[in-house]
A protein has these predicted regions:
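Helix-turn-helix DNA-binding elements, focusing on the entry/boundary residues of the two helices
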Residues: 18, 29, 44-47
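Short alpha-helical "recognition helix" segments of helix-turn-helix
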Residues: 21-22
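DNA major-groove recognition helix of helix-turn-helix/homeodomain DNA-binding modules
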Residues: 45-60
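Alpha-helical DNA-recognition elements
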Residues: 38, 49, 67
Length: 67
């Protein structure tokens, strides 16, 4: 299955860590790690919060599902 989110890439581009993101969102670091490895996906509200923290559009956090 194709990775749905680009969270790990955006964290690197923004020079932030998954621990930082977990603290900002009040989430467990394991949860954020699962998002970064695409084992789990954040809900739309959380994606919107993440986009706001990074100053990007939600679509910048997602990979296209088109082939």
């Amino acid at each position: 299955m194709k990775d749905l989110n680009r969270l790990k890439i955006v964290l690197v581009e923004q020079k932030k860590t998954s621990k930082w993101l977990a603290e900002q969102l009040g989430k467990n670091t394991a949860t954020v790690s699962n998002w970064c490895t695409n084992k789990l996906q954040p809900d739309l509200q959380t994606l919107d919060r993440i986009a706001g923290l990074f100053g990007v559009d939600v679509k910048d956090l997602l990979n296209s599902t088109r082939e």
